[in-house]
A protein has these predicted regions:
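Conserved ASCE P-loop ATPase motor domains encompassing nucleic-acid-directed helicases/translocases
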Residues: 1-10
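P-loop NTPase motor domains
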Residues: 9-66, 72, 121, 125-133, ...
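Hydrophobic anchor at the beta1->P-loop junction of P-loop NTPases
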Residues: 84
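Conserved lysine of the Walker
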Residues: 92
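Hydrophobic positions on the alpha1 helix immediately C-terminal to the Walker A/P-loop
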Residues: 95
Length: 404
């Protein structure tokens, strides 16, 4: 085998300046070239160089700079939402670090980075050295962080005209309509968002439990959230998880309801009680921790990114998005963009309840100057409910795409 002629022959022929086309009469070592190939190699015929607005600068395959800027109104048609896709090991986190460094240098936006694995720790250190304020949040037991998932319930009492339907028959129609009219702006459905949070607490994010949830159950949940909101607004305090649990138990005492409905209400209240005690109670059943004013907020999902914490992760993410939304509403006239970056997005988006929520909230963000950037590794992880979100996002960056 060591003395095989063919490998040695090929090695010699492929040495620089050794190959002689005239000697290759059978055309074993040559192939047809098209005029396009020659044009691509010519210096007068280059590759795309982008829009010329250097918000983000990369290099194309020819080594020339390619520039584009999602935050520039001249570069976008609809929005600056961005989707970064690539298989494992393709460099999503490294690319995001590169992009965020460039965008921060040019626009100095307010950044909210949700990650798992400390991929942006050095970026935070670098930004802090250059004078930016950096706030780090770790979602783990004992971290002292408190997220109030029902904190926005006061809006239901403050603006009752904007409360969406409580009719059980119309609830599924809302979901069908959400998949249509992606381009249209819509009012925020606060009651629908709070219902999603309550359902996640009741079902624990389990498919089997979610399948048991009927439209009548959902209507009762919405009514109990409204009851809790009215009670807490009268007492001038934040709506906590225990208030919704108590409202479910109170309605279960209603003698006019059938026994089966009352038993179901008690069952849902007991399920929510898991989020009112222990570590989950510390995180989700206290008045929310005030977020300090910072240029960059890095949220490490930590414990919640592991298996078995699906409900806690989803509720925490909803609370984070609500926090970003409140800041965006407050600062919408300051002209400073807000970018919410989610790395390892497949951890978040695989929950079918979260996708409609993200679709609704990000549709509003276009008017508030806040942008949703998502990085994930597998499109198959996205549920069908996430299709409107993908249609809405204008900017896609694909890294080393697999053949299929």
């Amino acid at each position: 085998e060591e003395d095989e002629v063919a490998p040695l022959n090929s090695y010699l022929r492929w040495l620089p300046c050794v190959f002689d086309p005239a000697a290759d009469k059978r055309q074993w070592y040559t192939q047809l070239m098209f005029a396009q190939h020659a044009a691509n190699l010519a210096p007068v015929w280059g590759r795309s160089q982008g829009t010329g607005h250097p918000g983000i600068t990369f290099f194309n395959r020819g080594g020339a700079p390619i520039t584009f800027d999602p935050l520039n109104r001249l570069d976008r048609q609809m929005n600056a939402h961005l989707f970064l896709f690539g298989p494992t090991g393709s460099g999503k986190s490294a690319t995001l670090n590169n992009i965020l460094n460039q965008v921060t240098a040019i626009y100095r936006p307010r950044l909210f980075i949700v990650e798992a694995g400390n991929s942006f720790g050095l970026f935070g250190d670098f930004a802090a050295r250059l004078g930016l304020t950096v706030h780090r949040v770790k979602l783990a037991p004992g971290a002292g962080v408190s997220l109030a998932p029902f904190a926005d319930a006061w809006r239901l009492v403050d603006t009752p005209s904007q409360v969406q339907t409580l009719d059980a028959d119309a609830l599924d129609e809302d979901q069908t309509d959400a998949g249509m009219a992606v381009e249209g702006d819509e009012q925020r459905d606060v009651l629908g968002e709070l219902e999603i949070t309550a359902r996640l607490m009741i079902t624990g994010g389990e498919d089997k439990e979610e399948a048991r949830m009927t439209r009548a159950d959902r209507s009762l949940i919405r009514q109990c959230i409204l009851d809790a909101a009215q009670h807490c607004v009268a007492d001038e305090r934040t709506v906590l998880t225990r208030d919704v649990r108590d409202a479910l138990r109170e309605r279960a005492r209603d003698a006019t309801l059938p026994e089966m409905r009352r038993a179901r209400l008690l069952e849902m209240a007991d399920a929510m009680d898991m989020f009112c005690q222990g570590v989950d109670g510390e995180m989700f059943d206290r008045s929310g921790t005030p977020w300090p004013e910072a240029d960059i907020t890095i949220v490490d999902l930590a414990t919640f990114a592991r298996e078995g914490y699906n409900a806690q992760l989803s509720i925490a993410y909803i609370s984070l998005i609500n926090t970003v939304n409140n800041i965006a509403e407050r600062d919408q006239y300051l002209g400073r963009p807000i970018i919410n970056v989610t790395d390892e997005g497949h951890i978040i988006t695989k929950n079918p309840l979260l996708a409609p929520y993200v679709v609704k909230i990000t549709k509003m963000w276009r008017k508030l100057g806040a942008w949703f950037w998502l990085a994930t590794q597998n499109l198959d992880d996205l549920p069908k409910a996430a299709e409107p979100m993908l249609n809405m996002i204008e900017w896609w960056i694909c890294l080393s795409m697999p053949p299929d």
